[in-house]
Regions:
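Flexible, compositionally biased loop and terminal segments
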Residues: 1-119
Length: 119
């Protein structure tokens, strides 16, 4: 409702593990000490610096795996898997993904409220 910006990322020839290695190498080159490293600092050195972590990641082709994609940034993302291949992914498929996403309870790593209520 209050969202005014949409970020859409398309990644080609990208690997999340390689991105993390590049970030670590850059920190070492700049002389950053181990005790200075924290989540915010690592975020700064990633390719996605300055962008919010994704809320929703759509995986096409029917594969049920993350394929080394945004492995740092996707920690609390919601995933939607569709059998459609990327060239066939259209407005209707996007609508399905967004409807599915809108029905989810975003927990950001926390337990569901149904699991934390005392009985």
């Amino acid at each position: 409702r209050d969202n005014t910006v949409l970020n859409l990322n398309l990644a080609f020839n990208y690997g999340g593990r390689d991105e993390i290695v590049c970030a670590i190498r850059e920190m070492i080159r700049e002389g950053i000490q181990a005790d200075e490293v924290n989540i915010d600092l690592v975020d700064h050195y990633l390719f996605t610096n300055g962008m919010p972590d994704p809320d929703l990641i759509i995986r096409t082709s029917g594969e049920m795996r993350i394929s080394n994609f945004l492995i740092w940034q996707a920690a609390y993302s919601e995933w939607y898997f569709t059998p459609s291949y990327w060239p066939d992914f259209d407005r209707e498929e996007l609508h399905k993904a967004l409807l599915d996403y809108s029905a989810r309870e975003r927990r950001f790593g926390k337990l569901s409220t149904c699991c934390t209520e005392e009985t």
